[in-house]
């Protein structure tokens, strides 16, 4: 694996690069494990290294979506606006469990606490709606990137927020109209969106959002949407 100098990067974020992500094939079958660092190097992505991930879309009871702006300390896509929480299940028994994507949901509960400070007892993994999976690849810069199959998780409830500033620069709840304004700002270069969030906004999000209380019609655990 290539040697990359990380001395100029945020110390807390560099420590997270040692976490073991779940390696998969293009059909989301587990084939091994590797570090978060190796999974996010473009040099390895170009050779086909692919890992499992998730994106949480958390709505409050007013049907507003929680957005976060990634901190400037983040190694990939710093300062970009994105959905409520995006991360990876780890290669451990609890998060590898695949029945009803419970392992991915446990990982989401863990990261909602780590990033947004949401108490574990406020989010039961079984409350999350696993809709479908999205495959995508994107470069962050010349060194780092993403190559993931992303599990889409929806959750509607009011929660307590206490974000970690090392993870999150800002956050807000938005209506559909406010998100559309943010997308316009991104198109004009005023702000940046993460590539996975942009893909989901452009394809599925508003249709799902219109049917928050009737999401079962959109559940598709067979297909992987290749973007």
UniProtKB/Swiss-Prot annotation:
Q: Which segment of this protein is annotated as the motif Microbody targeting signal? A: 225-227
List residues binding Mg(2+).
Answer: 40, 51, 146, 148
One matching Pfam family: NUDIX
EC category: isomerase
Record's superkingdom? Eukaryota
Keywords on record: Acetylation, Cholesterol biosynthesis, Cholesterol metabolism, Isomerase, Isoprene biosynthesis, Lipid biosynthesis, Lipid metabolism, Magnesium, Metal-binding, Peroxisome, Steroid biosynthesis, Steroid metabolism, Sterol biosynthesis, Sterol metabolism
The UniProt subunit note reads as follows: Monomer.
Task: Please identify the protein, giving its name as recorded.
Answer: Isopentenyl-diphosphate Delta-isomerase 1
Could you tell me which species this protein originates from?
Mesocricetus auratus (Golden hamster)
């Amino acid at each position: 694996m290539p040697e990359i100098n990380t001395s100029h990067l945020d110390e807390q974020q560099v420590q997270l690069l040692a976490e073991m992500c779940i390696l998969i094939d293009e059909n989301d079958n587990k084939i091994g494990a590797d570090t978060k660092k190796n999974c996010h190097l473009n040099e390895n992505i170009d050779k086909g290294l692919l890992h499992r991930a998730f994106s949480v879309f958390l709505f409050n009871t007013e049907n507003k979506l929680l957005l976060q702006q990634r901190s400037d300390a983040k190694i990939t896509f710093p300062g970009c606006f994105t959905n409520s929480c995006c991360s990876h299940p780890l290669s451990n028994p609890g998060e590898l469990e695949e029945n009803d994507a419970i392992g991915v949901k446990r990982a989401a509960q863990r990261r909602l606490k780590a990033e947004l400070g949401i108490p574990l007892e406020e989010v039961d993994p079984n409350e999350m709606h696993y809709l479908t999976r999205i495959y995508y690849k994107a470069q962050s810069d010349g060194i780092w990137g993403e190559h993931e199959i992303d599990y889409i998780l929806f959750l509607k409830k009011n929660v307590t927020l206490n974000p970690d500033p090392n993870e999150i620069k800002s956050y807000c709840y938005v209506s559909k109209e406010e998100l559309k304004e943010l997308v316009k700002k991104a198109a004009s270069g005023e702000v940046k969106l993460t590539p996975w969030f942009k893909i989901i906004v452009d394809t599925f999000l508003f249709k799902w959002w219109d049917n928050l209380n009737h999401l079962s019609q959109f559940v598709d655990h067979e297909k992987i949407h290749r973007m």
